[in-house]
Amino acid sequence: KQLIRKNNQTNPSSLLLLLHSHFLSSVSFGVSPRISEMEIGAGIGLYPLHRCKTIYLVRHAQGIHNVDGEKNYKAYMSHDYFDAELTQLGWQQVDSLRKHVHSSGLHKKVELVISSPLMRTMQTAVGVFGGEGYTDMSDVLPLMVANAGNSSRAAISSLNCPPIITEESCREHLGVHPCDQRRSISDYQFLFPAVDFSLIESDEDKLWKADVRETIEELAARGKKFLNWLWTRKEKEIAIVTHSGFLFHTLNALQNECHPDVKKEICSHFANCELRSMVIVDRSMLGSDVSVTDYPGKIPKGIDLPSDVTVVEDNINDE
């Protein structure tokens, strides 16, 4: 009652918030350090469903550059690895992830696949999420032609699978390393006929520089911009096939306010062909989606003042 008089709160909803805040500030947190850390520093978040998207983050399978690069970082400077394609082991990793995507039912949930426009990511994207049973007799273009990027693989069908588009902003760390330089879009369109390249503005690679390496801050900012761009898309469940550096620096830059174990789960380096399912939340009204599952109530209309609000109003009047 003293709290009510002091703050002159007469609006019921404001009063409830005030009482809730006062209760929390008055609670003694005499609990174990682990519980305190989890409950105080990493509380549960609650958001409207229509302001959330599920994203399936995938790092590409093993590329030819990874084999030597993981032994000696300087190997990434070799022009032999220009726009590196997948190794045969990489294709086996693709096959394994494809089996998981189908056995788990993800192939029925994913509405859109976004791929970085490099050979290894597009090979991974079409191999994991593409259709099956392509024949030359089909009048539908394949996602990938036979033996694209020295794959020794048959053509991959574009039937019965989500659309696959490419987007420059989810590319790997730009500059210096030839493995991260892309070919012309004209070349890719021949190798990946049914992949959508319409978002790529330039045929030649104007983003990659031989003597300038993108800073980590620039990469992280690009990653955040990419995630914000997802809110311009209508799809709610999106697979993104991209790169280790892009994923690591983008996710770490988000500074998630969560338990350290959860943060580690989100931000640790991805293995080749690893998939992680995550939810992103539009907390800044970036998107304009309207909920298709919410229901406004009051149909037909009637008196429906909540009983707890009525009690609060009665208590105020008693004073």
Model-derived segments and spans:
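Glycine-rich phosphate-binding loop signature in dinucleotide/nucleotide-binding domains
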Residues: 104-108, 230-236
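Intrinsically disordered, low-complexity basic segments at termini and long loops, enriched
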Residues: 1-28
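Acidic, low-complexity terminal tails and accessory targeting/binding regions
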Residues: 19-55, 64-73, 134-156, 172-194, ...
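Beta-strand elements within well-structured catalytic alpha/beta cores of enzymes
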Residues: 54-58, 114, 236-246, 250
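Histidine/lysine/aspartate-rich catalytic loop segments that bind and position anionic ligands
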Residues: 170, 186-189, 193-210
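Surface-exposed cleft-lining segments at the edges of enzyme active sites
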Residues: 77-84, 171-176, 203-220
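A short, acidic, amphipathic alpha-helical segment used as a generic capping/interface helix at domain edges
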Residues: 219-233
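Active-site-proximal alpha-helix that buttresses catalytic centers in soluble enzyme cores
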Residues: 30-161, 165-166, 186-191, 216-223
